[in-house]
Amino acid sequence: MVSFGSHTDFSVPHIQIRALNKTYASQGQHVHALKDIDLDIPEGKILGIIGKSGAGKSSLIRTLNGLEHPSSGSIKIYQNELTTLDHDHLIKLRQRIGMIFQHFNLMSAKTVWENVALPLKVSGYDKAEIKNRVDEVLSLVGLAHKADQYPAQLSGGQKQRVGIARALVHHPEILLCDEATSALDPESTSVILNLLKQINQELGITIVLITHEMQVIREICDQVVVIDHGEIVESGQVWSVFSNPVQPITQELLSLEQLELPFDLHREINANSTHSILRIKYQSEAHRSPDLNNILSSFDTPVYLYQSHIDTIQQHLIGNLIIGIPKLDLNINTLQQKLLPFIHHIEVIGYARPTH
C-alpha cells in the first residue's frame, strides 16, 4: 500500500484505493491496464501520477469518478464505496469530483459563461444561484472579462481556465486533471499550474493529476506516484523521488541517464580506460548549501568535474555531480562511508579516457 505524509491520519484518507484491477478486451486478448493498485490520498494534497503513454494513468484517474468501472477492487471517497453505487448516487458523487481534460471539451456554440453554467443548469439550479456561482468561478480563474466570448476567441490557456471554472461550479472536494497542460505552450502551462496551486491552497481541494511531464510534478505536486505497465513501481514525496529515483522507468522519466559527456563512456573497464566516472547525489534543506569543497577534497586525488546540477524542490536542495577520478580500483563502499556526512549516494557509472 502506498501512503503519504508523516503527519496525516490515514484512518480516513480522502481517497482510498485497494487491490484495484482493470482489464480490457482487445482483439481477442485481455489487456491488464491496472494491476493490484493500493493507494491512499490524503485530503488537501496534490498528487501527481506519472508514466509513459499506455502505462495506465488515464485508466486509474477515470476510475476515480466512475467513468471507468474497475474489474475488481475497491475505491472509497471518504469511506463511501464508489464501485457499488447505483446510478443516482454516482451522479451525486460526481458533483463532488471535478475533472479537467487535455482538450478542454468546451461547446463551441456557447459562450464562456454558458459553458461554465451548463452543469448547474443540468442539475436544476435556479437562475440566481447559477449567475452567482458562474460569476464567482470566472472571477477566480481570471476570466470574468471573457464571459460573453466564444471558445474560438480564446487562447489554449484561456480555454483550459474555462474548463477549470466549469469543474469548480459544483464546489467539488476533489479535482481530477487529465494531462491538463500537455496541449499548452510553456507560458500557458505556467499560468494553469499557478492557478491549480491557488485553488488547492485557497479552497483546500484535493487534486489528482496525471502527466508525462516531470516538470509539472516538480512545480506543484506534494507527492508523486510512478506507474509502469499498470503497476505502481515507485512513490513518495516529490523531493525524495527526484533526489533518489530507484526504478529505471523513474530514472528515464527524469532523464538522469541521458548524460552529455565530452568523451565515450563504457560500462566496463577496457584497455583505454584511465578514469572511473562517478555520479554523486547529495541533498539538504534549502537554507543549507552543500559543502562541495569537502566532498571533492575527500578523494585525496585530482577530481575532474564534468557535470553539475542543483535544484530546489519542496524546500530541499538536490544536487547531482558527474566527476572523473584517475583510479580504476575504487572501493565504493569505503567512499560512501567517508563521504556520508556530505552525500547520500555515490556510484560508478562507467569508465573512460577523458581528454580534459
UniProtKB/Swiss-Prot annotation:
Location relative to the cell: Cell inner membrane
Principal location: membrane
Keywords, comma-separated and alphabetical: Amino-acid transport, ATP-binding, Cell inner membrane, Cell membrane, Membrane, Nucleotide-binding, Translocase, Transport
Topology class, membrane: Peripheral membrane protein
Domain of life from the UniProt record: Bacteria
Assembly and binders: The complex is composed of two ATP-binding proteins (MetN), two transmembrane proteins (MetI) and a solute-binding protein (MetQ).
Protein name (Swiss-Prot/TrEMBL): Methionine import ATP-binding protein MetN 1
Organism of origin: Acinetobacter baylyi (strain ATCC 33305 / BD413 / ADP1)
Lineage: Bacteria, Pseudomonadati, Pseudomonadota, Gammaproteobacteria, Moraxellales
